[in-house]
Amino acid sequence: MGLGYPGGPKVDKAAKEGKKVSIISVGWDPGMFSLNRLYANAILPDGKDYTFWGKGVSQGHSDAVRRIEGVKDCRQYTIPVEKAVEAVRSGSNPELTTREKHTRECFVVAEKGADLAKIENEIKTMPNYFSDYDTTVHFITEEELKRDHNRLPHGGFVLRSGKTGWNKENHHIIEYSLKLDSNPEFTSSIIVAYARAAYKMNQEG
């Protein structure tokens, strides 16, 4: 499964040689959102896909900030831009840049004596993580981080905006959303469900 991903063919080859069922990319994105995009494209072939993540903690982006010199800890929130979401829901099929779809907000605990201006600049200019987004950086205490940012919520939604009719006169929106109190717990629940399915499929030959 998942042969479209770079590692897919190798996983598939190993599974076939071992006479097992392989699974990859079975979280929620890639994973559940991927399945939603697949069936939405089949139902509305004349349309566009849109994906928004958040509001929630991005563990990868938080870790990227922690690697900056002078940073003790961080929580980074990915936030959908409401104006962009509403534009998609309206059926206008907008062309949206990365910056227009999401903002990023960082709550950073700095080491004592660290150069805060340097840290903020490094965050905002970090390629592949923050440079393409409008990013806000807040410096807070370790106590504030533990009190106000001690959970790992996340979520997001996938929309397919499409048209039908002889003159494309009818507009449709398919929207699938997740609102998660605990991203790790929800993701592990998906993986366990897929593991059960893989085991059953393997047992059935």
Whereabouts are the PLM-identified features?
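Rossmann-fold NAD(P)-binding glycine/threonine-rich loop
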Residues: M1-S22
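Gly/Ser/Thr-rich loops at beta-strand to alpha-helix junctions
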Residues: G2-Y5, S25-S34, K55-Q59, K112-G113, ...
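Oxidoreductase and adenylate-handling cofactor-binding alpha/beta cores
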Residues: D12, M32-K48, D63-D73, A197
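Short alpha-helices
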Residues: K19-N41, I191
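General beta-strand structural signal in soluble alpha/beta enzymes
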Residues: S22-V26, F52, R75-Q76
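Short beta-strand and adjoining strand-loop segment in the mid-core
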Residues: A42-I43, G47-G54, E105-A110
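C-terminal substrate-binding/catalytic lobe of Rossmann-fold NAD(P)-dependent oxidoreductases
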Residues: S58-A195
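C-terminal helix-rich "cap/oligomerization" subdomain common to oxidoreductases
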Residues: A197-G205
